[in-house]
């Protein structure tokens, strides 16, 4: 009897240890998950990240799946063991009663099955908060500030502050367009006046940013946002109308954009340490925003730091030049390569080819 009790305690300890190790596997927030086909499977459709913040989220996501599979296999194993080991037919063949021996009120086992899940949830919560804090932290020293304005159904990107290395004339650079910014400020509504929605109005554009160097999307041309690699970057977001959402899938992160973000208690700024991969990455609006929401794409084009400085210098020296001309100047494809403009009329979408190639 004493030996059976010892065996039972050993089994419970083993079960607790295995379940606990599943919880501790969640602690792999900064440990790279397996690569190859196993890594692809664990990502469950998530793309590879191109920022340190995205890598942190991707690693955490993969290790949560590792822990979930460990716990799932254990629980499925216990369930199947119970199904096939203790059933009425086998008991009848053995000459036993219809029901197996009842083992309720096993206090040690109940404690294990209560405490271990609590520990797993606590570990998961801890590393969720840790990863979230890293992703949302505003502790970088950004060398490029991008002002993002969303509107139905396109995007406007403007360059605000730039580090001296990227500034056209060197030194500190503030890319604000003073005339248009002053006009926007003049539209501000007096909150003490007799105005709708607590003093805010859609005519009030004072919260938006207007810059000297901007890229504006149109129905015929997907806007291409050019950014440097290996550079801390800040994104300042706002909507000119309804709620939108700025999403680059390779960031593994999205942030909603609102009109009057401060009044709506929303954080309009996020930062990234760097983008460590050059290339073209599609960006999308991830918030249902009306009729042509599905067509509201943009492209993120990342280049090295020297090429980005050349791009900014060309845009500054040639204010009437298009973004396509600036991209050609630095040896890049002039139009988006990861997505294409959509045909917006109903008749143009019936053949399944609902996109167009820029002229």
Curated annotation (Swiss-Prot):
<dbReference type="GO" id="GO:0042773">
    <property type="term" value="P:ATP synthesis coupled electron transport"/>
</dbReference>
<feature type="binding site">
    <location>
        <position position="293"/>
    </location>
    <ligand>
        <name>Cu cation A2</name>
    </ligand>
</feature>
<keyword id="KW-1133">Transmembrane helix</keyword>
<keyword id="KW-0249">Electron transport</keyword>
<feature type="binding site">
    <location>
        <position position="244"/>
    </location>
    <ligand>
        <name>Cu cation A1</name>
    </ligand>
</feature>
<keyword id="KW-0472">Membrane</keyword>
<feature type="binding site">
    <location>
        <position position="285"/>
    </location>
    <ligand>
        <name>Cu cation A2</name>
    </ligand>
</feature>
<dbReference type="InterPro" id="IPR001505">
    <property type="entry name" value="Copper_CuA"/>
</dbReference>
<keyword id="KW-0813">Transport</keyword>
<feature type="region of interest" description="Disordered">
    <location>
        <begin position="338"/>
        <end position="359"/>
    </location>
</feature>
<keyword id="KW-0449">Lipoprotein</keyword>
<dbReference type="InterPro" id="IPR036257">
    <property type="entry name" value="Cyt_c_oxidase_su2_TM_sf"/>
</dbReference>
<dbReference type="InterPro" id="IPR008972">
    <property type="entry name" value="Cupredoxin"/>
</dbReference>
<keyword id="KW-1278">Translocase</keyword>
<feature type="binding site">
    <location>
        <position position="287"/>
    </location>
    <ligand>
        <name>Cu cation A2</name>
    </ligand>
</feature>
<keyword id="KW-0732">Signal</keyword>
<feature type="binding site">
    <location>
        <position position="289"/>
    </location>
    <ligand>
        <name>Cu cation A2</name>
    </ligand>
</feature>
<feature type="binding site">
    <location>
        <position position="296"/>
    </location>
    <ligand>
        <name>Cu cation A1</name>
    </ligand>
</feature>
<dbReference type="Pfam" id="PF00116">
    <property type="entry name" value="COX2"/>
</dbReference>
<feature type="lipid moiety-binding region" description="N-palmitoyl cysteine">
    <location>
        <position position="29"/>
    </location>
</feature>
<keyword id="KW-0479">Metal-binding</keyword>
<feature type="transmembrane region" description="Helical">
    <location>
        <begin position="107"/>
        <end position="127"/>
    </location>
</feature>
<protein>
    <recommendedName>
        <fullName>Cytochrome c oxidase subunit 2</fullName>
        <ecNumber>7.1.1.9</ecNumber>
    </recommendedName>
</protein>
<feature type="binding site">
    <location>
        <position position="285"/>
    </location>
    <ligand>
        <name>Cu cation A1</name>
    </ligand>
</feature>
<feature type="binding site">
    <location>
        <position position="289"/>
    </location>
    <ligand>
        <name>Cu cation A1</name>
    </ligand>
</feature>
<dbReference type="GO" id="GO:0005507">
    <property type="term" value="F:copper ion binding"/>
</dbReference>
<keyword id="KW-1003">Cell membrane</keyword>
<dbReference type="InterPro" id="IPR045187">
    <property type="entry name" value="CcO_II"/>
</dbReference>
<comment type="subunit">
    <text>Associates with subunits I, III and IV to form cytochrome c oxidase.</text>
</comment>
<comment type="similarity">
    <text>Belongs to the cytochrome c oxidase subunit 2 family.</text>
</comment>
<keyword id="KW-0812">Transmembrane</keyword>
<keyword id="KW-0186">Copper</keyword>
<feature type="transmembrane region" description="Helical">
    <location>
        <begin position="64"/>
        <end position="84"/>
    </location>
</feature>
<comment type="function">
    <text>Subunits I and II form the functional core of the enzyme complex. Electrons originating in cytochrome c are transferred via heme a and Cu(A) to the binuclear center formed by heme a3 and Cu(B).</text>
</comment>
<feature type="signal peptide">
    <location>
        <begin position="1"/>
        <end position="28"/>
    </location>
</feature>
<dbReference type="InterPro" id="IPR002429">
    <property type="entry name" value="CcO_II-like_C"/>
</dbReference>
<keyword id="KW-0564">Palmitate</keyword>
<feature type="lipid moiety-binding region" description="S-diacylglycerol cysteine">
    <location>
        <position position="29"/>
    </location>
</feature>
<dbReference type="GO" id="GO:0004129">
    <property type="term" value="F:cytochrome-c oxidase activity"/>
</dbReference>
<dbReference type="GO" id="GO:0005886">
    <property type="term" value="C:plasma membrane"/>
</dbReference>
<keyword id="KW-0679">Respiratory chain</keyword>
